[in-house]
Amino acid sequence: MGIIDEAKRGQITDEMRAISKLEGIPVEKVRNRISEGKIMLIRNAKYPSRKLVPIGKGLTTKVNVNIGTSSEVVDLDMELQKVKVANKWGDTLMDLSTGGDLDAIRRDIIKASDLPVGTVPVYQIFIESFKKKSGGAYFTEDELLNTVEKHLKDGVAFMTIHAGITKDLAIRALKSDRIIPIVSRGGDMIAGWMIHNNSENPYRKNWDYVLEMFKEYDAVISLGDALRPGATGDAHDEFQIGELLETARLVKSALQKGVQVMVEGPGHVPLNEIAWDVKLMKKLTGGVPYYVLGPLPIDVGAPYDHIASAIGAAISSASGVDLLCYLTPAEHLGLPTVKQVEEGAIAYRIAAHAGDVVKLGRKARKWDDEVSYYRGKLDWENMISKLIDPQRAYQVYTQFGTPKVKACTMCGGYCPMMWAMDQVRKIGSSSSL
């Protein structure tokens, strides 16, 4: 029995209690929202991760870190270093490897990760088909489904399943005047398979069996957005919305079967359209968790897309997004280094909290209030210890040596907090004031 079925029966499990304690909300509310599909526990029940990661309504915004090899760069040691970065800064981790021994790489990443690990199974079967049959679209439906099952057996907790795109949508998108017809790698693979084989989406054709597999492991289906906009000029066109409508129907069928499901979102979206993108998705799907790639509000930001997209991510988080998929400085340019992975993860950690201050209110802002209290007292030790990156903060604080006065090296003796504390002491000691 999966966690949704348990919640629908009114049961309160140890996992629900753990979520309640972690997030600071009543356990009955956790149970009820799980039963409605509004809270998911990202896990593979047979191979639970070391970190508990719930996402959904009323919970803190979580951050996903993408790593993985490419056909150009296969360096497992580097990817395992990225896992360490993800363990420190992230909540979930996706292995998007497309180069090397994909089975071995995935298993090593899962072993090294404290976090639930996700994959895109069509990558593997497409690449294997390309190598063995001289064409990526030559794989069979059974081979795709067997790959999904293999990933589940390895302990994968969630998978991007591009089931929303139909053959008709794919053909029309490719013939359209979209700036970039398809930017999703997995979505493009499924589209190519449908056109090559003149057949409907293999995930859709075998949807009931896909649900059975995920139900067995109580893992999470992440419904991919194959037709997400890859340019701000393509945002919210008929193809993105058409796929979302198909996805919403799949969400309902998954929840009816007691299968955990979330929906993936764009992408490239102008700043003024981000909030209503979230509202539209939540309305169409009944409020299941939303997993969004930023979004990027501009297309010209590389090599600073981690900054540009964090702006969009803060707005999407504040508007109700539950899981943010980070971008790195290498986005749109190449495979990220370990350092670039860290830069992206930190930017998104900041964006997630900025959104939570709006979405969760005082519960999230307590952290900021505590830092501000110590800052006002010039209590550097306590203030720095509470910051998002204490180690880096201390390095900056001491980069010109230890300040000669109680203030920092920016204001020195002219620090307003130092002056204010002195005036408070004078007011307190004067009987005439």
UniProtKB/Swiss-Prot annotation:
Family recorded in the similarity comment: Belongs to the ThiC family.
Cofactor(s) listed: [4Fe-4S] cluster
Segments crossing the lipid bilayer: none
Function, in words: Catalyzes the synthesis of the hydroxymethylpyrimidine phosphate (HMP-P) moiety of thiamine from aminoimidazole ribotide (AIR) in a radical S-adenosyl-L-methionine (SAM)-dependent reaction.
Enzyme class name: lyase
InterPro entries the UniProt entry points to: ThiC, ThiC/Bza_core_dom, ThiC/BzaA/B
Binding site for [4Fe-4S] cluster: 408, 411, 415
Pfam family, one: ThiC_Rad_SAM
Pathway in which the depicted protein is active: Cofactor biosynthesis; thiamine diphosphate biosynthesis
Bound cofactor: record note: Binds 1 [4Fe-4S] cluster per subunit. The cluster is coordinated with 3 cysteines and an exchangeable S-adenosyl-L-methionine.
Annotated binding of substrate, by residue: 66, 94, 123, 162, 184-186, 225-228, 264, 291
Annotated PANTHER family: PHOSPHOMETHYLPYRIMIDINE SYNTHASE, CHLOROPLASTIC, THIAMINE BIOSYNTHESIS PROTEIN THIC
Annotated organism of origin: Saccharolobus solfataricus (strain ATCC 35092 / DSM 1617 / JCM 11322 / P2) (Sulfolobus solfataricus)
Entry protein name: Phosphomethylpyrimidine synthase 2
Superkingdom, taxonomy of origin: Archaea
